[in-house]
Amino acid sequence: AQAQNAYRTNKDISYVSGSETDTYRQERCKLDIYYPENKKDFSTIVWFHGGGMEGGNKFIPKELREQGFAVVAVNYRLSPKAKNPAYIEDAAEAVAWVFKNIEKYGGRKDHIFVSGHSAGGYLSLILAMDKKYMAAYGADADSVAAYLPVSGQTVTHFTIRKERGLPDGIPVVDEYAPVNKARKETAPLVLITGDKHLEMAARYEENALLEAVLKSIGNKKVTLYEMQGFDHGQVLGPACRLIADYVKRFK
């Protein structure tokens, strides 16, 4: 039975072209793939770590391990060494890599889910709403089975504002705001945040705004979960359990 449930991790696979000359891209644009060895047609979650697009590293959340699906943990370039939209483009290229390669590992192309926490949630959301990023790498954002961003910003990310020298805390809604790119026809979208009284400032409300805007334009594929009792960091574990359950039930 042990062999049946064996999982393997392949680390530090480059998801950029072999002809890439940018040394920072060569260094950061790598992913780990954790997958069931003796299973075919499994689902895959692409996971973007948090850290404000200024820090953090790829990891496989423990609640997503040994669940019968693969997890692809992605590193992407960080600010201030790289500037917007570098990290969004990296996220898009990583998802496109999964579409091109997951079948080699035994995974299903039509069961690729995109998720992440905090900055990773923002990256998931901007890919879901603005199709141009994945299109640049030959992938269709709407071919993703579902997006499940955890505690992501739906306005323009605070690190992008910081790069522009703008004051903290005052929202900007421009082309880098997922809410500004809201569309009627998208892949299913499961928004998850911590408790509105414990979360980062306006984080729940931003997600509630995106849900309301999507519904107002006729999008029928959006759901919002507020995980009561959990703050911005603590929500990761329970959110991952919700994500694992969603992926396993997905038809």
Model-derived features with residue positions:
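Short amphipathic alpha-helix adjacent to the substrate-entry channel of hydrolases
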Residues: 57-74
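C-terminal catalytic histidine-bearing segment of alpha/beta-hydrolase fold enzymes
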Residues: 208, 215-251
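Short beta-strand element of the alpha/beta-hydrolase
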Residues: 41-51
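N-terminal cap/lid segment of alpha/beta-hydrolase-fold proteins
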Residues: 3-40
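Alpha/beta-hydrolase active-site loop
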Residues: 82-103, 126
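The feature captures the conserved acid-bearing segment of alpha/beta-hydrolase catalytic domains
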Residues: 138-160, 168-212, 216
